[in-house]
Regions:
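N-terminal membrane topogenic signal
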Residues: 1-10
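Active-site-adjacent helix/loop segment of glycosyltransferases
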Residues: 4, 291-342
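Short helical patches
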Residues: 5, 436, 440-451
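Membrane-embedded multi-pass helical conduit in multi-pass membrane proteins
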Residues: 19-57, 62-66, 326-411
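Non-transmembrane catalytic domains and loops of membrane-associated enzymes and transporters
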Residues: 65-315, 446, 450-451, 458-464, ...
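Cytosolic juxtamembrane regulatory segments of multi-pass membrane proteins
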Residues: 72-86, 396-406, 422-441
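Short linear elements at protein peripheries
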Residues: 228, 234-236, 412-437
């Protein structure tokens, strides 16, 4: 009954849009004819959005065919004392063969009681592999340490404020039965979606970003451009050769300290497929305050800008349709601020008001399309909150592209140093890492720009007892 009503609503929506165009055709076409650049942008955006929806309608998750590789779940954590035990518990409670599952919690030198909480979890669940880096190296350093400790064929990353569904891992690994797949991203919902209007809006946006955008990218020859850290899996043998370049990535002469997931995905995409698995679900905590939300969006925008430069170099060799969608998704954020300013300036200077009106109504129409799609898939009453995104987009977010460029060298969030090889200290016993993941410090420093305290890493062949790296394992 409800689904029928939603289908009717979507049909009615299409009728309203067509009616709007017909009734205002003189104004609309006159406005577009006088401004060919605005017309080109408007038509391109409509085709882009509708094209994604059409492709996404054909998306289906890979079914469970009994594929059960060994899995290592890695949880990098920094100052998450309130939620880390819940995250660990959700990872240990997944419906997956215990003999084929490893869970690793890495404390990135937290200044609160995160390490104590991890130790409490270790006492409750002895199978947990617990590591602390002693001081803050940044998320990428914690992820890299987890990779070095992992033994599974598949590496699953879970953010320390995220929670896996019971069947998430089983579903997440199924696409890896295809040897061409190097990474898989699951679906994330907002755990705190009921807190306020901002979290409700983000729930609708998250759903659209995963189900529509990643769903489309996945169908187009496995070209998902970001395996989000709240629930993502990688083939270990594919990651290890890329580990050095990713961990010590620099940009504009500085260490890359955010966008870790997008950067790793970018490297995987050069030789393998990255797909979306909607049936592998997780929940993550979203910002509840506008200030935090805007900072998060700016970080994401900066990493998107950095990695898009790499995408431009090779994506044309991927699926042609995927390349068109991807290059368009890069071009539009650069064009949008000028379109907004052009429309507003034209109205303020006494020009034809149709441009501004057409842009605002068109943007709301696209937002309504996403919201109705959410309503069709999720009957939780939150669909209308997707419309509030338009106001934030046109007033703030649309201009973040250029602000991100101007502040690109500001890497204060997640600043880190790193070592290549840490010693494992357990009750006074120091044990070297497995030799297959060891890297000579000289080579890494020379190629990728070694941080000063990288010198503390142990050189190939040195005595482990002489190493004083700040890594504890319990």
């Amino acid at each position: 009954m409800l689904r029928g009503a939603l289908k009717l609503a979507i049909v009615a929506y299409a009728a309203v849009i067509l009616g709007f165009v017909w009734l205002t055709k003189d104004l609309t076409f006159a406005t577009l004819a006088r401004d060919p650049l605005f017309a080109t942008y408007s038509i391109a955006v409509v085709l882009y959005v509708l094209g994604r929806f059409v492709v996404a309608l054909f998306y289906r998750s890979v079914p469970d065919r009994g594929f059960r590789p060994t899995v290592s779940i890695i949880i990098p954590a920094f100052n998450e004392e309130d939620g880390i035990i819940g995250t660990i518990a959700s990872c240990l409670a997944v419906d997956y063969p215990a003999s084929r599952l490893q869970v690793i919690a890495v404390d990135d030198g937290s200044s609160d009681r995160t390490w104590e909480r991890i130790q409490e979890a270790k006492q409750r669940w002895p199978q947990l592999y617990a590591v602390t880096l002693g001081r803050n190296y940044g998320k990428r350093g914690a992820m890299a340490e987890g990779i070095r400790r992992a033994t599974g064929e598949i590496l699953v990353f879970v953010d320390s404020d995220s929670y896996l569904d019971a069947d998430a891992v089983v579903n997440l690994v199924q696409p890896f039965a295809d040897r061409r797949v190097g990474a898989v991203v699951g679906h994330a919902d907002v755990r705190n979606s009921g807190v306020n209007w901002l979290t409700k809006m983000q729930q609708v946006r998250y759903f659209s970003a995963f189900r529509v955008i990643k769903g489309t990218e996945s169908l187009l020859s496995g070209t998902v451009t970001c395996a989000s850290g709240c629930c993502a899996a990688y083939r270990r043998r594919v990651v290890l050769p890329l580990l050095e370049g990713w961990e010590f990535q620099t940009f504009l002469g500085r260490p890359a300290t955010f966008g870790d997931d997008r950067a790793l995905t970018n490297r995987i995409l050069t030789g393998h497929r990255v797909v979306y698995q909607a049936s592998a679900r997780a929940e993550t905590v979203a910002p509840e305050r506008l200030r935090v939300f805007f900072r998060q969006q700016l970080r994401w925008k900066k990493s998107w800008l950095r990695e898009s430069m790499q995408v431009l170099r090779y994506f044309w060799r991927k699926n042609p349709a995927a390349a068109v969608f991807t290059y368009a998704s890069i071009a539009f954020p650069f064009m949008a601020p000028w379109v907004v300013l052009h429309a507003v300036a034209g109205r303020l200077l006494g020009g034809e008001p149709g441009g501004l009106w057409f842009y605002v109504v068109g943007t709301y129409a696209m937002a309504l399309l996403y919201s109705l799609f959410y309503a069709f898939k999720r009957q939780d009453g939150l669909w209308f909150h997707g419309m509030t995104f338009v106001a934030l987009y046109m007033s703030v977010l649309v201009f973040q592209t250029y602000w991100g460029i101007l502040t690109m060298r500001d890497t204060r969030w997640g600043t880190r140093a790193s070592t290549v090889e840490h010693a494992r200290i357990d009750q006074g016993l120091v044990v070297a890492l497995p030799p297959d993941v060891r890297r000579p410090p000289q080579a890494m420093g020379a190629r990728f720009g070694r941080p000063d305290d990288y010198q503390h890493g142990r050189r190939e062949g040195e005595s482990a007892a002489a190493d004083h790296a700040p890594v504890l394992e319990r």
